[in-house]
Amino acid sequence: MKIVADQNIPALSDLLSGAGTLSYFSERIPPQKLLAEADALLVRSVTQVDEVLLEQAPELKFVASATIGTEHINLQALEERGIGFAHAPGANAQSVGEYVLCAVLNWLSDQPRYVADEIDVAIVGAGHTGKAAGKRLEALGLNVHYYDPPLCKKGVKFVHDHWQRVLTADIISCHVPLTRDGDFPTQHLFENTALQSLHSQQLLINASRGAVIDNNALLERVEQGERPSLVLDVWENEPEVLSGLVPYVDIATPHIAGHSLEGKVGGAVMISNALLEHFGKPADKTLSDVLPGKAWNERDAGGLNSLESLNLWAKEHYDLFRDDELFRQQGLTTEGFDSLRRNYRKESPRREFINQVVTCHNSEQYIQFLQLGFSARLLSK
């Protein structure tokens, strides 16, 4: 079996050892020579698997994407050709949740005074990443609600479909797939009218897909002044970035919210097992089989009993502003944007907060830090 894979999907040589011949590609589109003989193709969201690509891959039997989204895959074309498909929903959810947590901690630290349960948070999209973000913000004591009309239509109880409630929230965090049709399209969900309604006391976060927010309309809005605080990890038309928008964004990053080591390796494990299963081979690899050991670091909860101390500790383990600085320096060209994603923290991979242990003195602390995504240890009395 000949397997063609994006070179930035980690651990494949270990996960697929003995499964076949593994060849890598480094650009967005695999070389025609590799496609011509490929039995399986493993991609990231930067590769468009469309009719043009599939015409070059007559032997292809299986495609997988190491991502949660599928908008870069022509699923109908795969089905018509009898080509199997898999992706990795939820693999990077904890990583995205931590990105949002760090962004919100930073924003809250700049608020002169606030009462936690009076901060209204709208999570737009109640899938894996939305729930991971929401759980962490609930652990801060914030008032979190979930906007998800498709789930609401199905009768799911913990979501709502009140758009105005979203637009009036103090914090809005986007976690939806990019859809262009159907009953609830998300492309330009935040268009001119919605963006004009936002004000300077709000925080808008997008860690889903760039085109969920109309970037040109957003630029028009922020140029008017009294803008909301902005955290953008994704950009419409990326790797091209609307450069005029960047100076108005408080935290700007190159689509790396989900790029923790655990998130990337987790996606690789999911699609590798799916590939092996598709071809009738044993598929029993786990994250612990290929992930480096945890970098344990212990901290007493008593030293984390304020927002300031928690924010500072979170920054020690994931400093958003390091990624923001590199993006502003290098990410405003298509080549620079792709390079930042491709080479993201290669020398010192970003590890998730679960590697950090918080020693807790009561059950309330224990539950809170587990919800925040840390490991926790409850001292016995």
From Swiss-Prot:
Gene Ontology molecular-function annotations: 4-phosphoerythronate dehydrogenase activity; NAD binding; protein dimerization activity
Gene Ontology CC terms, in alphabetical order: cytoplasm
Catalyzed reactions: 4-phospho-D-erythronate + NAD(+) = (R)-3-hydroxy-2-oxo-4-phosphooxybutanoate + NADH + H(+)
Keyword Cytoplasm (UniProt): yes
UniProt keywords, alphabetically: Cytoplasm, NAD, Oxidoreductase, Pyridoxine biosynthesis
Annotated metabolic or biological route of this protein: Cofactor biosynthesis; pyridoxine 5'-phosphate biosynthesis; pyridoxine 5'-phosphate from D-erythrose 4-phosphate: step 2/5
Pfam families the record matches: 2-Hacid_dh, 2-Hacid_dh_C, DUF3410
Residues annotated for substrate binding in this entry: 45, 67
Signal peptide positions on this chain: none
Residues engaged in binding NAD(+): 148, 207-209, 233, 258
Subunit (UniProt): Homodimer.
Purpose of the protein: Catalyzes the oxidation of erythronate-4-phosphate to 3-hydroxy-2-oxo-4-phosphonooxybutanoate.
Name of this protein: Erythronate-4-phosphate dehydrogenase
Organism for this UniProt entry: Idiomarina loihiensis (strain ATCC BAA-735 / DSM 15497 / L2-TR)
